[in-house]
Design a protein with these regions (language model features):
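Mid-to-C-terminal alpha-helical segments outside catalytic/metal-binding sites
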Residues: 18-66, 80-84, 88-132, 139-146, ...
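Active-site gating/metal-coordination segments in enzymes
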Residues: 44, 150-243, 247
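Ligand-binding grooves and catalytic loops that recognize ribose/phosphate and carbohydrate rings
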Residues: 198-208, 213-230, 248-251, 257, ...
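Active-site neighborhood of phospho(di)ester-bond hydrolases with catalytic His/Asp-centered motifs
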Residues: 68-70, 159, 186-187, 276-279, ...
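Conserved, mostly hydrophobic/aromatic
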Residues: 71, 148, 234, 301, ...
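Histidine-centered divalent metal-coordination motifs
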Residues: 71-77, 244, 280
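Catalytic pocket-lining loop regions of alpha/beta-barrel enzymes
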Residues: 208-213, 220-324, 371
């Protein structure tokens, strides 16, 4: 059995290409005949699950929904108060990977950045964080919800990142979740601040469904004693910890040193009551993260950024009950990660609902739906 879609001209020239996805290689898993490289974001509409509506990429196959995105952000602010209007809709969301960029599913996702786009990203996240403009001005709640609605995403999880005493990103994310029912928020407490347990209780009372930890941004080793104490507090409160896990290749050397997957085993092993979701599934060290997930039942893998081949490997070898979809929006359009899950599950569609919805719903304690009844 296969899926076919009529040829569509490529946006940057080239020959029309028919997409044909067939299932059933010699292991019984899905195989993508073509394509794995797309000329731009709109070119994903050549896949059988997507189409273009008024120039915007949408999911056209209603069987894909519902979806939960476990890894999203709105604009973050440090040093100065938040200057972006988080509730302002703009005509377009400026993703850090621009919609015009070529997208290669065979590589880790950030390998698709051009030098110019990467430079713009870094400038927007650093100096731009002090302003009310730039790309960050489009990283708002209504823009996120618009993209969700176009793709069948019923919930997106916001992941705020705090630095000691100079940010209130968790406050803004939790406020967004209170205002917008399609948004869920994790909390964030920097491990070195005082009253960690009290702060976690306050955030949980405000609606936090878990805690985000980013060793590279928060400048702390994942196995630091204060980080270990934070994980222990989270486990006692049944708050899953979503960790940025693994080097991504574009961070500072200090960040690369703090995100080596080997450093995550100590907290995982010593805090078995705590659920650890390894963001980006270990990034460029996917095999090491997959090994942790195979050896420890308190480890989940979140797929944002991974190549199509790595998504297939994870779904083949990991416990499919502990794998979740994430996009890392607004770094990337939410459709990119969905497309990889759909392509990786051709011929084993029973895994789709687990990865796209059921597992995240269970982790977040959401009510049962028709997809996990």
């Amino acid at each position: 059995m296969g899926y076919e879609k009529s040829p569509r001209p490529l946006a940057r020239g080239g020959s029309p290409q028919r997409v044909r996805l067939v299932h059933g290689d010699n292991r019984g898993y899905g195989v993508t005949m073509s394509p794995q490289v797309f000329e731009n974001l709109s070119d994903l509409s050549r896949l059988p699950w997507f189409d273009l509506h008024d120039g915007r990429l949408v999911v056209s196959d209603q069987s894909v929904a519902p979806v939960i995105d476990m890894h999203t952000h709105i604009a973050l602010a440090y040093l100065l108060p938040m200057r972006v209007d988080l509730y302002r809709a703009t005509p377009h969301t400026e993703h850090y990977l621009p919609a015009c960029c070529r997208i290669d599913f065979e590589v880790y996702q950030n390998k698709n950045f051009t030098p110019a786009a990467l430079s713009t990203l870094k400038r927007d996240l650093t100096l731009g964080s002090l302003s009310r403009g730039g790309m960050r001005a489009t990283h708002t709640v209504p823009n996120l919800v618009r993209e969700m609605d176009e793709l069948g995403i019923v919930h997106s999880v916001l992941l705020p990142i705090e630095l000691p005493y100079i940010s209130k990103n968790a406050v803004h994310a939790l406020d967004a979740a209170r205002r917008e029912p399609k948004v869920i928020s994790f909390g964030s407490v920097h491990p070195i601040v005082d009253r960690v347990g009290t702060r976690l209780d306050e955030q949980a009372h405000a609606g936090a469904r878990g805690v985000k930890v980013h060793p590279a941004v928060q400048l702390i080793m994942p196995d630091h004693p204060r980080a270990m104490a934070l994980y222990r507090h989270c486990g006692a409160r049944n708050l899953p910890v979503l960790l940025h896990c693994g080097p991504v290749g574009i961070e500072l050397q200090s960040g690369r040193r703090r995100t080596q997957v080997a450093l995550y085993e100590k907290p995982i092993a010593e805090e078995p009551r705590t659920t650890f979701v390894l963001g980006h599934a270990g990034a460029l060290q996917m095999e090491q993260a997959l090994d942790l997930a195979c050896r420890y039942p308190n480890v989940w893998l979140e797929l944002s950024g991974q190549s199509l081949a790595n998504v297939r490997t994870i779904l083949e070898r990991a416990d499919p009950e502990r794998v979740v979809y994430g996009s890392d929006c607004p770094f990337y359009h939410q459709a990119i990660g969905i497309a990889k899950v759909l392509m990786a599950t051709v011929g084993r569609e029973h895994l789709r609902a687990k990865v796209l919805y059921q597992n995240a719903a269970r982790l977040l304690g959401l009510q049962r739906s028709r997809h996990n009844a």
